[in-house]
């Protein structure tokens, strides 16, 4: 299971439409379908009931959606925390100057 599979699943679950999910994710419909199908294979269950006209979450899909959406939300928050920590990190550097007096021949 990877984050791309989770993103595709969550987006399809929210839109209940593979085409709209693909557009939202800037992916092709076959790519989104592949990610969802590979996730279903990995989990060993169907997450969606598909007909030619509609997509609907199965009971397993509904249960998985709650956790998958939370995982993605927590990941995004974690990334934001890391970015914020990096932005607030102060970097110090030293500048050393060596003063030398002019030599008599430079005068």
Go through each PLM region and give its residues.
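Single conserved hydrophobic/aromatic residue that forms the stacking wall/gate
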Residues: 99-107
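Short helix-boundary/capping micro-motifs
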Residues: 10-27
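Short, well-ordered beta-strand elements
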Residues: 91-98
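Alpha-helical linker/hinge and terminal dimerization helices associated
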Residues: 42-43, 64-86
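Conserved amphipathic alpha-helical core elements
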Residues: 9, 39-40
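A short LG(V/I)-centered, amphipathic sequence patch enriched
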Residues: 40-59, 80
């Amino acid at each position: 299971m990877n984050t791309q599979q989770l993103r595709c699943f969550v987006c399809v679950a929210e839109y209940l439409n593979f085409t709209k999910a693909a557009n939202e994710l800037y992916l092709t419909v076959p790519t989104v379908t592949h990610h969802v199908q590979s996730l279903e294979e990995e989990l060993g269950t169907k997450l969606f009931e598909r007909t030619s006209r509609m997509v609907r979450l199965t009971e397993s899909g509904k249960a998985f959606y709650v956790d998958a959406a939370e995982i993605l939300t927590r990941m995004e928050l974690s990334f934001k925390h890391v970015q914020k920590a990096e932005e607030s990190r102060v970097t110090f550097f030293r500048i050393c100057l060596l003063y030398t007096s002019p030599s008599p021949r430079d005068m």
